[in-house]
């Protein structure tokens, strides 16, 4: 099962993932750590697409091996969420604006989610 924890920067995604991961015994991928491993800090639409597909690839590997996996990342658009293709979505709707204006402008509130915090 792929769980996406999404929301604006500073909304608490990583905080929640850190606490949920041991409770579920899940694999966990944090977007900043994955970007660091890939040395890819491109936040253009193309860069965000690559990141979503990168996160999907890591999560799918865990899912195929019957592990629950948590991915925490902004996943700002309907398209990036569709590409990632989560089984469950937790939307952290805890702040009105994040610290990056470009992300605030790009962010689309999800129409589909399982939990909204």
Predicted features by range, described:
Residues 17-60, 64:
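Conserved substrate/cofactor phosphate-moiety recognition/catalytic segment
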Residues 2-4:
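Short hydrophobic/aromatic beta-strand immediately N-terminal to the Walker A/P-loop
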Residues 24, 85-87, 112:
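Short, structured coil segments at secondary-structure junctions
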Residues 8-9:
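The conserved Walker
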Residues 45-100:
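Glycine-rich phosphate-binding loop used to anchor ATP phosphates in small-molecule kinases
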